[in-house]
UniProtKB/Swiss-Prot annotation:
Parts of the chain that traverse the membrane: none
Keyword Transit peptide: no
Protein name stated in the entry: Mitochondrial import inner membrane translocase subunit TIM9
Record family assignment: Belongs to the small Tim family.
Recorded superkingdom: Eukaryota
Gene3D superfamilies: Mitochondrial import inner membrane translocase subunit tim13 like domains (1.10.287.810)
Cystine connections: C35-C59, C39-C55
Annotated gene: TIM9
Membrane topology reported for the UniProt record: Peripheral membrane protein
Transmembrane helix in keyword set: no
Motif segment (Twin CX3C motif): 35-59
A GO-annotated cellular component: mitochondrial intermembrane space protein transporter complex
């Protein structure tokens, strides 16, 4: 990164930010699809039932905790690789 000039660093930073946004949107979309499919099954009303609401809360919590844990493991692996260098 030190070898890049200011313009190149800005371009690189912009690419990183775009990738992060794309990854976030993919995660969000996956969360919505999975939890909706698992929890919402009564289409007779446009309002969620209390059961569906509870299921959606638990599903999203579980999904986000899992994603956080995976991220932590990646950070640990990355740190271990950096120490080996």
């Amino acid at each position: 990164m030190d070898q890049l000039n200011n313009r190149e660093q800005q371009e690189f930073q912009q690419l990183v930010e775009q990738k992060q946004m794309k990854d976030f949107m993919r995660l969000y979309s996956s969360l919505v699809q999975r939890c909706f499919t698992d929890c919402v099954n009564d289409f007779t009303s446009k309002a969620l039932s209390s059961r569906e609401e509870s299921c959606l809360e638990k599903c999203s919590e579980k999904f986000l905790k899992h994603s956080e844990r995976v991220g932590q493991r990646f950070q640990e692996q990355n740190a271990a690789l950096m120490q080996k260098r």
